[in-house]
Amino acid sequence: MVKFPALTHYWPLIRFLVPLGITNIAIDFGEQALNRGIAAVKEDAVEMLASYGLAYSLMKFFAGPMSDFKNVGLVFVNSKRDRAKAVLCMVVAGAIAAVFHTLIAYSDLGYYIINKLHHVDESVGSKTRRAFLYLAAFPFMDAMAWTHAGILLKHKYSFLVGCASISDVIAQVVFVAILLHSHLECREPLLIPILSLYMGALVRCTTLCLGYYRNIHDIIPDRSGPELGGDATIRKMLSFWWPLALILATQRISRPIVNLFVSRDLGGSSAATEAVAILTATYPVGHMPYGWLTEIRAVYPAFDKNNPSNKLANTNNTVTSAHIKKFTFVCMALSLTLCFVMFWTPNVSEKILIDIIGVDFAFAELCVIPLRIFSFFPVPVTVRAHLTGWLMTLKKTFVLAPSSVLRIIVLITSLVVLPYLGVHGATLGVGSLLAGFVGESTMVALAACYVYRKQKKKMENESATEGEDSAMTDMPPAEEVTDIVEMREENE
């Protein structure tokens, strides 16, 4: 067997990240396959797709940030007691989400948000609210799965996490195919995608929970000792989580904002419809070569030796901070190479769109320029992911909150200003998204510099204090000095 000594320190990082990257790409493919399966319903297919899509997007926007509790499990859960606190947080959050779903389904608030704000007719609106009610339990299942995924990632079981997510996608596709041949197609077609979604989540949650109990539950202590940083409090967990949740919420709302401004810029004409369609087609394709880079933020908390919570999980860890930085740079270079090969090589991007999305060649040609803009996304995404992971290790996520605000400000500013420079349509949308990413990454970099300077100053002060203490310790006690003087006088 051929060995590469130079890669010895990088194999753990590769084994950790590859399953997560494959999972990220598989989810993109899975959503496309699920939508194609839903569209196979014979009656009211378009209306059902619209109702389910609207309900699903609302559910992901309001409850999606709970998926960032994966990072709470990754950073904070060092004992059975810590896990119990994390699970309690998710039970409460799931209950709040269920109440919110019920209010949207039955109150005037739901009618305003769905019917009025989205300008849909009564039939689509009622089906959307019903679908939203059916999805009430999904955020809880999703959050429970992600919490245990974070705990498994801390102990380097990324392959198991990847298998669970891929099993989720496979279960969704399989159950759509099964339910399409059942009586649900006639009685309640909305339940076909929703039940498939629940079955996929059940498979993922069960896999992750069983993986936790089999591999981790018996090896972690009942309580965290001082060497592991002590027991985490619910307040610390929530303080760590909310900036990450805010960032995810702004990411989820960015695309609807882009669609709205692009459509309004073209006056709601057929060109506007075409531009939004191009954005819809190009986003999953453009996202594939760089989307997996966001998983890099889990590397620092999982491998950094300076993180006290890794002492239990990383008994044989040979990975240093320098290795993580080099590995991150190589990942960025690989993603950039993929982007330029896929989107700048003649006819390659068109073929991908025709084969995967199913568009015609004329439409695919219109997507070329937006896809080429996606080629530059890996740089800001890598910077953001790497520095976010470092800040997560230090539990300083609160400094990330301004980056989400700046992203929205830069995004909207670009959408308003660029049309005056002659940029319109899908190019306007993707260009503004890139500007938002750059703005967000810049703010994250500034926040990281601020934290780094504070950490450096703190270490210098501690070193100075230790130096003074050691100097005081080296001086002999006053009684010993007196005895020495008396002995000299006697000798004289």
Curated annotation (Swiss-Prot):
RNA-binding keyword on record: no
One Gene Ontology term of the molecular function aspect: phosphate transmembrane transporter activity
Lipid bilayer topology: Multi-pass membrane protein
Transmembrane segments: 86-106, 132-152, 159-179, 190-210, 327-347, 351-371, 404-426, 430-452
Residue span of region Disordered: 458-492
Pfam families: ANKH
Keywords for this protein: Cell membrane, Membrane, Transmembrane, Transmembrane helix, Transport
Protein's name in the database: Mineralization regulator ANKH
